């Protein structure tokens, strides 16, 4: 019978089978039903159960040869404080399979064996143990004087569990602080798996087995703070020297973390003979330690293969404790004749912030021709990286920097990177034409025989005036050397190095007498920052020959992230806001008559511009929202007067990295005089603003911040000729109007207070324009509604723009960031509706302005109380 059919059939079997047995007076009591079928024994839980002693009936059936299925039926099973002194009290199954499944919560807590060499609380051999389809599983603070603090079995399959699985603080006097097995499968679990603070006196702080397959788990795996003699978290070794044993496979898991594990001897996180790590999500080995192999130790004659298929593989701050060298950084230790088969970075990087150490091979493998090469392959934009960038200056000793590989290295494709003073030693290294070797200045590559390089890249950002790339080899061939400049490194922003001419900058050091590679090309690709020319030559000393570079500085081109014209263009934002304010105030001269009124209105304005230079840095948008309030009067003769004040809160941003917050304080006055033939109106407005600039750099480390002040005034004077129709159409009257508008704004210069600090000069903007248009209106006495529509063509008569230079304070370099010169022609449309409600009058005002490189919208909602 299949295990997944057992749960469905157990109740029927109870009724129909003559061999059905009910146990009522033991630890299970009425919580479970045990049935014996021809080929299996089934224990089905009928309710939650808590035990401090195993059911005698359950123990009796466990000792039979038939497979035993313990089915939770989505109930809970808690076992705690169980301390058996004899095998009769222990859950011991010596033949047949055992399956514990379908529990909502399965817990074994504070259970222990009290006699020496006694097995685990759950001990199973000569069969398979299944823990599957459970929700939460917890094995906490269990102990065994034998092997397997919580579980001991020949074959364990921990599969298809779906909430959380936790092995914590279990311990063993021998092997496997939590689990001891010959074969172990942790596969296809939806639940996250955590092994934390488990310990074993011998091997495998959390797990000890001969074969481990960990694959297809869709939530993270955590191995943290476990400890043992060998294999702080996992020990998977060949104790019987059988070639098919001692294999560990981590594959297709979502995320895996080994952190804080320790071993007194070998393998801070893992000690195994054969290991394959492939096609996982992110895998991290962090802060693990051992005498040999801070993170991973490979047994003599074994092998290790790492394929970063779904995320990066990281080794960081792992350490080993040599008696003669103290504590040094170490990621991987390969014992005698153990091989590092491949490093493949496909969809993630392989990052070694700790070195690799490989023992010297035995004499029969001492010739490079007999050794299997280490194959390095990476996809585009991925790399195998050796780096010491996370070490302090004091920690950068040779023992913490050097990776010793005893196999030939074949760089078959992609990119191998040596960074920040690391040293790579190997018998030989060969490079395929499509592969790239990247070496920072200060790094070293040493081979005892042939070194054949097709392309060597030296990153410009690593250059200083003292160190060089060092290569030591009896025979050397380099076809091409070039200097690489990553757009993210900003090498050409280096003030100390590039602001003046430099002589004899060391790049590459070779043993004397080796043939010189061709000189790098001095015509580098276009870039921002300091501009200049490179020249290269070889210099010879007593024992070395050095490739040196000479730099001749010419000019400076600022990075686009520094060039934003948003500060100067803020005056355009102020201009647009004041146009919106004037539009709102003009509505007080329209509508029904009243002796005196007080009013308030919400004001909003949206302004978009794409400049006229074609640069994305000149595109910007501005949004403002605020309020106006005032007093006004509007006579029957259409004379009007208004005083207003208000505040606007604005947000501006370009299409790159710069934004500005604005707080504006506004005061305005408006008047209108009307006769039967003509209406004359005038308006003046004053604006004082405080601006705060924020630059969230993508290419520089610090955020920029600055603040400045601006003042602006605007005004208009206009005349309109009203023409009254018969009132039967859509509008009752229309008028032809013309205005003369003026705006003048000035903002102070300022310096940014942090980040890539810049100084901005004063700027000013003056504009005189002539709107000409036609307006339509309709008054409805029945509904007390008033409608007004206006359309106008605007021609700018005179414009004066003054914007000073921007200065980068760290090098005093200046450049222009001119204010946008938008089109001098514009179209403006406005629609207003007012409705009288006894003493209250509501207002809706919408306007739209279209200019050659910009457009704006405004919307006002207000009310007037009429006395």
Swiss-Prot record:
InterPro entries: Autotransporte_beta, Autotransporte_beta_dom_sf, Polymorphic_membr_middle, POMP_repeat. SMART domains: Autotransporter. The keyword Metal-binding does not apply. SUPFAM superfamilies: Autotransporter (SSF103515). It is a peripheral membrane protein. GO terms for cellular component: cell outer membrane; extracellular region. It is found in: Secreted, Cell wall; Cell outer membrane. Its main location: secreted. Residues 591-867 form the Autotransporter domain. It holds the Pfam family ChlamPMP_M. Keywords: Cell outer membrane, Cell wall, Membrane, Secreted, Signal, Transmembrane, Transmembrane beta strand. Residues 1-29 form the signal peptide. NCBIfam families: POMP_repeat (TIGR01376). Belongs to the PMP outer membrane protein family. This is Probable outer membrane protein PmpI. It comes from Chlamydia muridarum (strain MoPn / Nigg). The gene is pmpI.
